[in-house]
Structures are given as structure tokens and as C-alpha cells.
């Protein structure tokens, strides 16, 4: 694997790309990072992801792997000699996949709509977002990590969103630390890992980016 060529097409605010960077760091994989603005469909992005034309795209020896959750599994299988990401137990693995899908299918929409909407729609979105935060906190329970004692797949899946938490709080007018103390303790534990810290974007910079997006989409 020492001679492998690994390239990551990503955009700095992408929570999905942050996941992939965490996984690569956990495995100690060296890679070339190529900043790729998703609003500008570069020839390389179109070539590597012709169906969706979205980032992140992981390119391993010229072969593209799309979708962040798929990338996590790919990274875990290819670089299997260090820091397992997915549980080995089939049942626990299925649960991790279930909850990761919950994050992207249920949590994702209100996580950005909370800063992109106003009025009654905003109130409904905020309510939905808080319910999903509570669901995720309940699933965590008293475990150090979502997979138990070991940092892994589901932790990476949710921590990818961490850089956006502050924007969610600001525009949603709520406090994660106050309303979800167990989840807050978990985030602090995850932030002790170098792989996580180095993968995350600056939260204040994300807020500045949100203002740009609000203006772009007429939500300012």
C-alpha cells in the first residue's frame, strides 16, 4: 500500500468530506487533497463522479469511490491493518449502518434548513432538528462512543457535522451543550483525537459561509 496513489476531491465546508478525512487519518493514509468547489463542475470531478458530480470523491490508484459512507467502508477494508472503523460483529455493523443512514436521511435536511428558512417553516425545522439531536443522544446513552468503547464508523459519520453545530445553534437559537449534555460530552471526547481535530473546518468560518449561502439563496 506504500506506493498507492490516493487523492481526495473535497470542498472545505463539506461535512461529508470531513468524514473521509477523519477515516484516512485514523488509518494513517497519506493522500493528495484537491480543493473542488461543488458549484464549479471541474473536468476531473465530472470524470470521477459523472452521475452525481458531487464531492467528496476518493480516488485510489485512479479509481473513484463516491459517497462518504461508502468511502468509510472502503477505507476500512483496504487499509484493514490499523484502527478498525466498522464493528466486526455483523449485528453491530448493521446498527452502525442504520444510524449513519438515519443521520444522512433524517438529520441532514433540518441541519441546513435551520439556517435557510424563516417563519413557521423555520419553527417546524428547528423542532425536527432538536428531535433528531435527542434521538441521537438517546442512542449514544452512557457509552463513550457510539460503537461502545472504541471510536468508529458512527462517531465519524456524526462528527462530520460538528463544524456546522455552531451555525445550527446560532440560526436555530438553541444550545447543544444545554439541551444535550450527553452528546456534548461525547463531542469533547471525540475532539481529543488528532484525526478529528485536523479534519474539521473552523466553526466561525462555517458561519461566515452560511451568511454567503443565505444571501445566495435569498434567506438573508
From Swiss-Prot:
- GO annotation, biological process: glutathione metabolic process; response to cold; response to herbicide; toxin catabolic process
Q: Name one GO cellular component term.
A: cytoplasm
Q: What is the enzyme's main class?
A: transferase
The record's catalysed reaction(s) read:
RX + glutathione = an S-substituted glutathione + a halide anion + H(+)
Quote the record's binding site residues for glutathione.
14-15, 40-41, 54-55, 67-68
UniProt cross-references to Pfam families, sorted A to Z: GST_C_2 (PF13410), GST_N (PF02798)
What does the UniProt function comment say about this protein? In vitro, possesses glutathione S-transferase activity toward 1-chloro-2,4-dinitrobenzene (CDNB). May be involved in the conjugation of reduced glutathione to a wide number of exogenous and endogenous hydrophobic electrophiles and have a detoxification role against certain herbicides.
UniProt name for this protein: Glutathione S-transferase U26
What is the species of this protein?
Answer: Arabidopsis thaliana (Mouse-ear cress)
Gene for this chain: GSTU26
Amino acid at each position: 500500500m506504500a506506493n498507492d496513489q490516493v487523492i481526495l476531491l473535497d470542498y472545505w465546508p463539506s461535512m461529508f468530506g470531513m468524514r473521509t478525512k477523519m477515516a484516512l487519518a485514523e488509518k494513517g493514509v497519506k493522500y493528495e487533497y484537491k480543493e473542488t468547489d461543488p458549484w464549479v463542475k471541474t473536468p476531473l470531478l465530472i470524470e470521477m463522479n459523472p452521475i452525481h458530480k458531487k464531492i467528496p470523491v476518493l480516488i485510489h490508484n485512479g479509481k473513484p469511490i463516491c459517497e462518504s459512507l461508502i468511502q468509510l467502508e472502503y477505507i476500512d477494508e483496504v487499509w484493514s491493518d490499523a484502527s478498525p472503523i466498522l464493528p466486526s460483529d455483523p449485528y453491530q455493523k448493521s446498527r452502525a449502518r442504520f444510524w449513519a443512514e438515519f443521520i444522512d436521511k433524517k438529520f441532514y435536511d433540518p441541519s441546513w434548513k435551520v439556517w435557510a428558512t424563516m417563519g413557521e417553516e423555520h419553527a417546524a425545522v428547528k423542532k425536527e432538528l432538536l428531535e433528531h439531536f435527542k434521538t441521537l443522544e438517546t442512542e449514544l446513552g452512557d457509552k463513550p462512543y457510539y460503537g461502545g468503547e472504541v471510536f468508529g464508523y458512527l462517531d465519524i459519520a456524526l462528527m462530520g457535522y460538528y463544524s456546522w453545530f455552531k451555525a445550527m445553534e446560532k440560526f436555530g437559537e438553541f444550545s447543544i451543550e444545554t439541551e444535550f449534555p450527553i452528546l456534548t460530552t461525547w463531542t469533547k471526547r471525540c475532539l481529543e483525537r488528532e484525526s478529528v481535530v485536523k479534519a474539521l473546518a473552523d466553526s466561525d468560518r462555517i458561519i461566515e459561509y452560511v451568511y454567503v449561502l443565505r444571501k445566495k439563496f435569498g434567506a438573508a
